[in-house]
Each structure stands twice: as structure tokens, then as C-alpha cells.
Amino acid sequence: MASKKVCIVGSGNWGSAIAKIVGGNAAQLAQFDPRVTMWVFEEDIGGKKLTEIINTQHENVKYLPGHKLPPNVVAVPDVVQAAADADILIFVVPHQFIGKICDQLKGHLKANATGISLIKGVDEGPNGLKLISEVIGEHLGIPMSVLMGANIASEVADEKFCETTIGCKDPAQGQLLKELMQTPNFRITVVQEVDTVEICGALKNVVAVGAGFCDGLGFGDNTKAAVIRLGLMEMIAFAKLFRSGPVSSATFLESCGVADLITTCYGGRNRKVAEAFARTGKSIEQLEKELLNGQKLQGPETARELHSILQHKGLVDKFPLFMAVYKVCYEGQPVGEFIRCLQNHPEHM
């Protein structure tokens, strides 16, 4: 069997952390081509191109400083060139940009290429919810899997132990992806319920914004635990409403579900920015620049898409926590009123 060529589409914080793992495994395992391409959105860093820095210093000095990438990971500034020969495409870019990237890649991929999305977000489709893996799969005509879990990028790059979940309908492909990405400290469970895995990954960012509001307003651990639990209830209810396939509670107990929700509500960037938003009154855009090096926040954007989907279906009242996050972020509702969505939650009625 010819060795599989791998391309990582994206090179931010999470993309670079995954490149470290994938590059290391591809160099050692016969089933993969050792040369891993990584598409890098070209930027100028102190008069040098970011791709040149990565290819000479083997470090993404902007998005994952202090971590060496394997020398077999090659940064490529042209996405079509990076992906042209790939058998496996790993998508890891902010979900706002995926449509444009797919437009560029369309018609330029290998006939039997497959993809895996690490992107946490949802899109609006004609029938309401559209998952990012569906957007990619339909645009490019390739089968898609997903990887979601309690994986804060800096900790993964530090090789601290964590778990993750791959959702893949084809068991053989799931096993291949596990071989490509598993390490002693990055442990993978493969499940077949792809949709539920991906919904968990998208919706937890909205809950984390609520958790950050909680922290910024000075509420305690009990309140935050309530945000996490009520958020999980809304995630499960949303999945059951919008997915045609099975939605089992067991999937919510995998790393992609409750574990990712907990870590994001305590350690993720959505929580951090939401806390600063509640404390300072600065805009989300301003805080992205100050706290995230200009990287985009997924939680508020996902809340906006959820609002549109739920409004279309007349179900806004059934998801008070999701909608409270939307109202604070986009409709100018005072953040101090966030607690009301908890006090009047239908779970207690």
C-alpha cells in the first residue's frame, strides 16, 4: 500500500499543536509519507515571511512560540499547492474562513482524498443547522470525519496528557486516523456518531462564554457549575432537535462532550475573553486583539448562528442560556442580567 500523504489546512495555535503530533507520527510510521505539508496564511513577522521562519527555525513564532515543530512539517503559503497531493486533509482554521478555503480547493484535490475537521463551529443551512464537516464534504466532495475533545492547544503542545474523540463512520478510516494522531499523551477514542461529536465541539464554546461572564461578574463555583450543567442540557436538547441520526447520551460522556465543556469553561480562550468583557466593558473585537494576538473567538459567532437557526424554527425560548450569550454579545443586553437566564431556566419550571 502506498504511504498516505497528509496536509494540515491551517497553522494557528491548534493547527501548529496538531502539526507537532502528526509530523512526529508520520516520520515514524510506514503507512504515512514523512513529508507533511501545512498551509500557512502568509504573514510578515519582523520583516520575514512566517513560512520561511517555520521552514528554517521549525517554530511557529506567532501562534505557537516556544515549541519546535518536526522538520518534516513543511509550511506552504498556497493552500492549493499544500493540498494537491494529499490523501488525508486535516482542517483546522477558524470556522468563519472555511467557505473561502473550500472555494479555493475545489477541483484541485486527489480523487480519493479524505478529510478530518478539527473546527469547532456551526453554519446556517437552508434547513437550519449545517455542520462544518458537512460544509467541507459538500464543497469538496470528500468523505469527512471529525476530531473534538478537551484539548487546549498549548497543553497538547506541552505534551500534557489529554484525551480526544474522533467521530468517523468508517471503522477502517477511523483506525487510520487514530494511528496518525495518537501518542502516549494524546489518547483517542473513535466513535461512529460523527454529528454528535461535532455538535459538542461547536456548542461548548457558547457555554464557555457564559462561564466567563460568570467569572467576570464575580459569581462563585456553584453558579459556574450550574452554567456548565444547564449548558450541557441545552447542548443535548439542541442535538436531539437538529440531527436526524441517533444522538446517544454516551457520546456526551466522551472527551468531546462533558470533558471538553469543563476544560473550556475553566481554561479556554472563550472564557478568558468573556470574563474580560464582563469586567472591562471593552468590545469582543478589542479584546481579541489584546488577549488573543488577533485570533478569532468562536463562541459569540456560534451564538449568533444559533440565534438565527432557533429564531427560524421558533425555538428561541427553549434555549435561554444560548440566547442570553447572544443578547449580551450582539444586542447590548447588560452582562449583569446574564444571571436571569439561569434563574428562569425551564429546567427548574
Swiss-Prot record:
The keyword NAD applies. Pfam families: NAD_Gly3P_dh_C, NAD_Gly3P_dh_N. The keyword Oxidoreductase applies. The active site is at K204. GO terms for molecular function: glycerol-3-phosphate dehydrogenase (NAD+) activity; NAD binding; protein homodimerization activity. InterPro entries: 6-PGluconate_DH-like_C_sf, 6PGD_dom2, G3P_DH_NAD-dep, G3P_DH_NAD-dep_C, G3P_DH_NAD-dep_euk, G3P_DH_NAD-dep_N, NAD(P)-bd_dom_sf. Keywords: Cytoplasm, NAD, Oxidoreductase, Phosphoprotein. It is an enzyme of class 1 (oxidoreductase). This is Glycerol-3-phosphate dehydrogenase [NAD(+)], cytoplasmic. It comes from Pongo abelii (Sumatran orangutan).
